[in-house]
Curated annotation (Swiss-Prot):
Upper taxonomic lineage: Bacteria, Bacillati, Cyanobacteriota, Cyanophyceae, Synechococcales
Binding site for L-aspartate: 87, 182, 253
Name of protein: Aspartate carbamoyltransferase catalytic subunit
Known partners and oligomeric status: Heterododecamer (2C3:3R2) of six catalytic PyrB chains organized as two trimers (C3), and six regulatory PyrI chains organized as three dimers (R2).
Pathway connected to this protein: Pyrimidine metabolism; UMP biosynthesis via de novo pathway; (S)-dihydroorotate from bicarbonate: step 2/3
MF terms (GO), sorted A to Z: amino acid binding; aspartate carbamoyltransferase activity
Catalytic activity, as annotated: carbamoyl phosphate + L-aspartate = N-carbamoyl-L-aspartate + phosphate + H(+)
InterPro entries documented for this protein: Asp/Orn_carbamoyltranf_P-bd, Asp/Orn_carbamoylTrfase, Asp/Orn_carbamoylTrfase_sf, Asp_carbamoyltransf, Asp_carbamoyltransf_Asp/Orn-bd
Keyword list, A-Z: Pyrimidine biosynthesis, Transferase
Enzyme Commission no: 2.1.3.2
Length: 348
């Protein structure tokens, strides 16, 4: 972990294979130890983590706040409805208010792309040492979700050593609304970095063909890709093409709130063509795990009985794994500024 080089975590395009290994290894150590009640880790004692969520959130916000508290950090939550934004205060001034209060990390979620990056750049220019962690921005990125999905898959394939090597050579199918999904974009960066081949499945209006080249060019603002060899991305139009040979399947929520008018007019037709069921998963040719980043539209992207089948569904496991992954990210960001807390040396 000594090679960690990210003050801010804004996306996964800039992550190297070593970065993924650092996060997954540390998260696995956190997952394997009790850290509630009196046994909280003192790693971030005296630090302040502020969650600035300008979009609704259940899982992500709660998970970050639990993660911070389990590392003994203080937590300050921001709610737009009761803030000075309604009085005309700018988003940057709101962020600076929390910096002035002593925030060490700002976890920022916003409906517009690049807002966390803009805040990070503004704070850097003014010499502030506060770190920014992207909790999801527009259609761009959701790095902690991509990492927890990666860890969930790695742990499923190799419970004792859930590292990037467990993903190498796997065929991972992602079904549904890729166009509007920052989760899908983060998963593309993470999965291909670890050597998985990703198959995207959906209608052209939700899975444009140009996604096949999504990870081929160097990430924006970088001269080269930090990952030497990536897996491939394929786009197909039917589940009959996508599922045979799959090692895992992820389905995505239809984000109707982000869709332009008439982009998708018939939910029943979508379920008929792309909804996952026990019967359809038989096309994989073997038992495979099912993931969904939530929230789930039962009866649209998948059948309710499939979601409740814990021999297949890893959805609740994804939620559980979100806490140790976010603990790992907060710890690594704190370690960027100072030496890691020696209490972690005792973790198995």
């Amino acid at each position: 972990m000594s090679g960690w080089s990210h003050r801010h975590i804004l996306d996964l395009a800039s992550f190297s294979l070593e970065d993924y290994s650092s996060v997954l290894e540390l998260a696995h150590r956190f997952r394997s130890m009790p850290v509630t009640g009196a046994r909280k880790l003192p790693a971030l004692q005296g630090r302040l983590v502020a969650t600035l969520f300008f979009e609704p959130s259940t899982r992500t916000r709660s998970s970050f706040e639990l993660a911070a508290r389990r590392l003994s950090a203080d937590v300050q939550s921001f709610t737009p409805a009761s803030s000075s934004l309604s009085k005309g205060e700018t988003l940057l001034d709101t962020a600076r208010t929390y910096v002035a209060m002593g925030a060490d990390v700002l976890v920022v979620r916003h409906g517009s792309t690049s807002v966390p990056e803009q805040l990070a750049c503004a704070l850097d220019r003014s010499g502030e040492r506060t770190a920014v962690l992207n909790g999801g921005d527009g259609l761009h990125s959701h790095p902690s979700q991509g990492l927890l999905d990666l860890y969930t898959l790695a742990h499923h394939f190799d419970p004792d050593h859930p590292l990037p090597e467990a993903i190498q050579g796997r065929r991972i199918v992602i079904v549904g609304d890729v166009l509007h999904s920052r989760v899908a974009r983060s998963n593309l960066w993470a999965l291909t970095a670890c050597g998985a081949d990703v198959v995207l499945c959906g209608p052209p209006s939700l899975v444009p063909q140009d996604f096949v080249a999504f990870v081929e060019a160097p990430p924006p603002g970088q001269a080269h890709d930090p990952v030497l060899h990536r897996g491939c991305v394929e786009v197909v139009r039917t589940l009959e093409e996508a599922l045979p040979g799959a090692d895992a399947v992820m389905t995505l929520r239809l984000q109707k709130e982000r869709m332009h008018q008439h982009l998708l007019t018939d939910l029943n037709r979508f379920h008929r063509d792309y909804g996952l069921t026990h019967e359809r998963l038989k096309l994989c040719g073997k038992p495979v795990p099912l993931l969904h980043p939530g929230p789930v539209n039962r009866g649209v992207e998948l059948g309710g009985s499939l979601l409740d089948d814990h021999s297949i569904s890893l959805v609740e496991e994804q939620v559980r794994n979100g806490i140790p992954i976010r603990m790992a990210l907060l710890y690594l960001m704190a370690a960027f500024e100072s030496s890691p807390d020696p209490s972690l040396e005792a973790i198995g």
